[in-house]
């Protein structure tokens, strides 16, 4: 604001007063009108409240004017332009401008955007997860359905006569031990030793190559059998050959000894029933009842 003119300075009628120019920050639209230089005697008293030459604080308060009807009329408040703060959307031309209103709206929007607080990124989560949660080991669901009754013991069928197990594993006969030798090419057993010791393997080879295709298997495997075909021819050939190879006469006694050894070994090693003419079985008692060896009801 321009300092007010001191009252003590004398003014002459011929003095010419120039209206002070606005600040360099005044809008360009206000400077478009030419300034008129007036003499001091032509100045009116309505300019006493000029904001540019008088102090607004020293001006006396203007009371409300009264109209003819007696109702008080409020005096319009003079618009004062702040020299320090100048808004670019205020128009000094006095005509409405659409450009000024649009720029004012955009300026207000930018002002609100700057005044708004910055968004908080982690507002939803109070703190970041730094420790991986431990995996919960759940037991797999049993989709097989309800568990059935426990399996019965395979040795629960007992013979009524001897009280031994009647299952196939326990009741099957036990054979003499045997093994394969010479890179799994030769079977070493009691019966094989008898065949090679009495030269019966030579007779089996002759029967394998000289008999018909239908009978070669039975004659070669069982050369001394009386129920096979060509029984007389086989026995006649073995009798004539025993004159040259007398060891063939030891074949039958040696085979009998193997049968006896097989029966004795089976009696010692077979844990199950050896009864031949009985089919009656009984059910084994429960595992918890150790004293009861036989149930009351056979079937």
Curated annotation (Swiss-Prot):
Pfam families on file: Sprouty
Assembly with partners or alone: Interacts (via C-terminus) with TESK1 (via both C- and N-termini); the interaction inhibits TESK1 kinase activity. Interacts with RAF1. Interacts with CAV1 (via C-terminus).
UniProt-annotated stretches for the region Disordered: 50-79, 92-127
Modified residues (Phosphoserine): 125
Domain notes: The Cys-rich domain is responsible for the localization of the protein to the membrane ruffles.
Compositionally biased spans, kind Low complexity: 92-107
Cysteine disulfide partners in this protein: none
Record membrane topology: Peripheral membrane protein
Annotated ranges, domain SPR: 166-273
Annotated GO MF terms: protein kinase inhibitor activity
Function field: Suppresses the insulin receptor and EGFR-transduced MAPK signaling pathway, but does not inhibit MAPK activation by a constitutively active mutant Ras. Probably impairs the formation of GTP-Ras. Inhibits Ras-independent, but not Ras-dependent, activation of RAF1. Represses integrin-mediated cell spreading via inhibition of TESK1-mediated phosphorylation of cofilin.
Keywords: Acetylation, Cell membrane, Cell projection, Cytoplasm, Developmental protein, Membrane, Phosphoprotein
Domain of life, per lineage: Eukaryota
Identification of the protein by name: Protein sprouty homolog 4
Residues bearing the modification N-acetylmethionine: 1
Primary localisation category: cytoplasm
Any GO BP annotation: negative regulation of ERK1 and ERK2 cascade
Gene Ontology CC: one annotated term: cytoplasm
Gene name tied to this protein: SPRY4
């Amino acid at each position: 604001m321009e300092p007010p003119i001191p009252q003590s300075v004398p003014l002459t009628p011929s003095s010419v007063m120039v209206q002070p120019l606005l600040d360099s920050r005044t809008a360009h639209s206000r400077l478009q009108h030419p300034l008129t230089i007036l003499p001091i005697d032509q100045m009116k008293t309505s300019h006493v409240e000029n904001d540019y030459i008088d102090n607004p604080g020293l001006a006396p308060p203007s009371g409300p004017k009264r109209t003819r009807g007696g109702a008080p009329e409020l005096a319009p408040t003079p618009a004062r332009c702040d020299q320090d703060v100048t808004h670019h959307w205020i128009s000094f031309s006095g005509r409405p401008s659409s450009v000024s209103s649009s720029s004012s709206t955009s300026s207000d929007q930018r002002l609100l955007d700057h005044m708004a607080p910055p968004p908080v990124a982690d507002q939803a989560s109070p703190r970041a997860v730094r420790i991986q949660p431990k995996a919960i080991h759940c037991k797999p669901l049993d989709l097989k359905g309800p568990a059935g009754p426990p399996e019965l013991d395979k040795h629960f069928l007992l013979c009524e006569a001897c009280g031994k197990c009647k299952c196939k594993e326990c009741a099957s006969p036990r054979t003499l031990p045997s093994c394969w030798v010479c890179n799994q090419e030769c079977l070493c057993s009691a019966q094989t030793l008898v065949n090679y010791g009495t030269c019966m393997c030579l007779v089996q080879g002759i029967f394998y190559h000289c008999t018909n295709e239908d009978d070669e298997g039975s004659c070669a495997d069982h050369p001394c059998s009386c129920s096979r075909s060509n029984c007389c021819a086989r026995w006649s050939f073995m009798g004539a050959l025993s004159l040259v190879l007398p060891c063939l006469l030891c074949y039958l006694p040696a085979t009998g000894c193997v049968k006896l050894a097989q029966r004795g070994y089976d009696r010692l090693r077979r844990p199950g029933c050896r009864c031949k003419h009985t089919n009656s079985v009984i059910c084994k008692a429960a595992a918890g009842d150790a004293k009861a060896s036989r149930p009351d009801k056979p079937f």
